[in-house]
């Protein structure tokens, strides 16, 4: 159709203005450009972002725009960007437009879905709350995840967000036999590469679909990759009735790329230079991550916190949507305790006796009280020393130090760094161990025996070995 052809009238970095003779493409419609750069044939996908008046549109490029010139031919697709869905996407890596980028045989999809879809309606959504066991002690005990809930992993650079995500993918594949979708939103290419090979080595690759829009790509690709991954997860939920795990690393980059796109489209920025539509854009993505009567999408989103400032508009806009927060703390990482989850800052909506049962709730709040008391006593200890404390406070400090150590755990995906085999700890074992510490059952065991182990049984074995050596 000649009418659906247009031409480039302006190229502004990743933004391209296109004019059509008699056709006006809809917002979110895909446009295709086939061109040649230095004798190499290239194709580029654009997505319509704004109507400029007349038959002119402003579109965001999903790849680099080098080599584009004015008056070049552009073809409208008449539909949105569509990506492959179904079991054939498992074990493969895709870019934002659904092309496989893992150097394997190109995928010829039998089914594709558009990346912009409506969120499930109120009637379709499920209101049932169930705990999702992760096998990670500190999470299951103090900030449990709910099936079909949204979890934020908060932390600055280099405190271990990606390692926790990899461990969760591992545990879901091995223990729950479930599918996962991983969306790499504006993160390091090296990390994406490492993740792929580690999953291949760990034998979990056939249970996960990977979608990457990395740091070096234009903002359009970094922003829309979250929708590409989500669409693949929605298929497993809606058509197959499965419980899927959706990982987004990093949701901050989704907001950041939205800010870049907004500025390029000429919108006036709001606080801290973010886009004026930040809350709406975040809601559009988050509302699609939901549990329906068919299946669920449980999502874990790593949230980079710029300069460790939780009041920054980007992390603040994510907070509103979360059911649980897992906050990583650099001070805990500096003590050598991994995962460096802050037991007092991390929260969960389901940490209540009605949702998780009286026993779990009592142990969790008991642990938090001991840790809080220890935190309050630290100023006194720093000034006067441990000897000035009452006998009861000394006991609290001893138990708190054991709890801190026992909250550490060797991960399967970190075996290569730590040399310790990974451990999956069931909720039952976790409650037994921490309940015993609170009751004073293990007051006679040295605190070093609690460090980097799985269940309390291992603590007792380690203490026995320490005594004998």
Swiss-Prot record:
Protein name per Swiss-Prot or TrEMBL: ATP synthase subunit beta
GO CC annotation, single: proton-transporting ATP synthase complex
CDD domains from the UniProt entry: ATP-synt_F1_beta_C, ATP-synt_F1_beta_N, F1-ATPase_beta_CD
Alphabetic keyword roster: ATP synthesis, ATP-binding, Cell inner membrane, Cell membrane, CF(1), Hydrogen ion transport, Ion transport, Membrane, Nucleotide-binding, Translocase, Transport
One GO molecular-function entry: proton-transporting ATP synthase activity, rotational mechanism
Compartments reported by the entry: Cell inner membrane
NCBIfam families reported for this sequence: atpD
Taxonomic lineage: Bacteria, Pseudomonadati, Campylobacterota, Epsilonproteobacteria, Campylobacterales
HAMAP family: ATP_synth_beta_bact
Ligand binding (ATP): 155-162
Subunit structure: F-type ATPases have 2 components, CF(1) - the catalytic core - and CF(0) - the membrane proton channel. CF(1) has five subunits: alpha(3), beta(3), gamma(1), delta(1), epsilon(1). CF(0) has three main subunits: a(1), b(2) and c(9-12). The alpha and beta chains form an alternating ring which encloses part of the gamma chain. CF(1) is attached to CF(0) by a central stalk formed by the gamma and epsilon chains, while a peripheral stalk is formed by the delta and b chains.
Pfam families: ATP-synt_ab, ATP-synt_ab_N, ATP-synt_VA_C
EC number(s) per entry: 7.1.2.2
Protein family according to the UniProt entry: Belongs to the ATPase alpha/beta chains family.
Membrane topology qualifier: Peripheral membrane protein
Job description of the protein: Produces ATP from ADP in the presence of a proton gradient across the membrane. The catalytic sites are hosted primarily by the beta subunits.
Organism domain of life: Bacteria
Reaction equations catalysed: ATP + H2O + 4 H(+)(in) = ADP + phosphate + 5 H(+)(out)
Keyword Disulfide bond found: no
